[in-house]
A protein has these predicted regions:
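Basic, often amphipathic N-terminal segments
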Residues: 1-66, 74, 88-142, 159-171
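Short proline/glycine- and acidic-rich turn/helix-capping motifs at secondary-structure junctions
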Residues: 70-78, 117, 147-158
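Charge-rich, low-complexity N-terminal segments
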Residues: 79, 85-86
Length: 171
């Protein structure tokens, strides 16, 4: 079974991202706008219980933090992804690191660049046109993040929440 760990931002930020994603992101229907903390990994139902207990401990060790959108950016020329760049503040980076320990699987397929995808898999010409238009716009947004989510992938490719972990809370 495939799992991942992500932050879902506020409805306001999700609505903003979706206004672009429905036109420019082929994965629009598979998962809501999110900030990936840990990329897709495979696990058994039995092992995910152990992982869930570790995530609970991680969530208690971190306080809510500010998520700040800085601007529109891209991963070009590596791949055609347009995203809202998220400030890589200390709390967010530390949380990301805490989710990549030996117990949770250290492998990080990419350098952590906090972002919220708004377009991907676009042909080069369309990618450059869209990026040019969006670069002229201001994307400034701040909000408090107080939770992260363990997600799992359904057979049809969509992602759904398996469990939610509140930051700084002891339950």
């Amino acid at each position: 079974m495939n799992f991942g760990i992500a932050i879902f931002p506020s409805k306001k930020l999700q609505d903003l991202a979706n206004s672009y994603r429905k036109r420019y992101d082929a994965h629009y229907k598979l998962i809501p706008p999110h900030v990936t903390l840990k990329s897709t990994f495979s696990s058994t139902e039995e092992d995910i219980k152990r992982i869930s207990a570790i995530l609970k401990d991680v969530s208690k060790a971190y306080e809510p933090f500010t998520l700040k959108v800085l601007k529109v950016s891209t991963f070009q020329p590596i791949n055609n992804v347009i995203y809202l760049k998220i400030d890589p503040n200390e709390e967010l980076v530390r949380l990301h690191e805490a989710l990549h320990t030996e117990e949770l699987g250290k492998e990080k397929p990419y350098t952590f660049i906090p972002h919220l995808t708004i377009g991907q898999d676009l042909p080069d010409k369309e990618m450059n046109d869209v990026l040019g238009q969006l670069s002229l716009m201001k994307f400034e947004h701040e909000e408090i993040i107080d939770r992260f989510h363990l997600l799992y992938q359904l057979e049809n490719g969509t992602w759904t929440v398996y469990e939610t972990f509140l930051l700084g809370k002891d339950f």
